[in-house]
Amino acid sequence: MQDEHKQGNRNLPEIHYASRDWTSKHPGRHNGETHLKTRDLVIQLRGLRIRKWHSCLFPWGTRLTDRCTLQMECEPDGAGVRPVAGDVAGPEESLQLREADLKEIRHPKLHTTGRSLCSERDAQRCHLRRQSV
């Protein structure tokens, strides 16, 4: 991965994430378990000026695979969206991307904003917009 990074692979995703403190319950596939934090992800392909935000609720120590994505925001030129700096939490090896995730980034719906991917999202947080960092 380091060699790919040095060679400037245009399809190499850059992933940034941070945590924010709050507690919530999500009744979907998580069986009503309490989630202590949310993790914000920015996924960007170097060859495209596209960044996607994912706000995911899940307990610490679990992997992204098979978890609900509660909210997604996309801006085709990356304007107003930048990597989250500071307050980085969690081991990087705990973050996994499925091939389906990468295909969705490579072939995005450029003008979709605030599209929900989880039908059982937290109703109190479904319309929250991202704060500037």
Curated annotation (Swiss-Prot):
Region (Disordered) residue spans: 1-35
Pfam families: Birna_VP5
Record field: compositional bias (Basic and acidic residues): 17-35
Result when mutating C68R: In strain: Isolate NVI-016
InterPro entries xrefs: Birna_VP5
Result when mutating L102F: In strain: Isolate NVI-013
Its job: VP5 is not required for viral replication in vivo and its absence does not alter the virulence characteristics of the virus or the establishment of persistent IPNV infection.
Additional comment: The sequence shown is that of Isolate NVI-020. The highly pathogenic isolates NVI-013, NVI-015, NVI-023 and Sp122 have a truncated VP5 protein.
Membership in a protein family: Belongs to the avibirnavirus/aquabirnavirus VP5 protein family.
Protein name (record): Protein VP5
Organism of derivation: Infectious pancreatic necrosis virus (strain Sp)
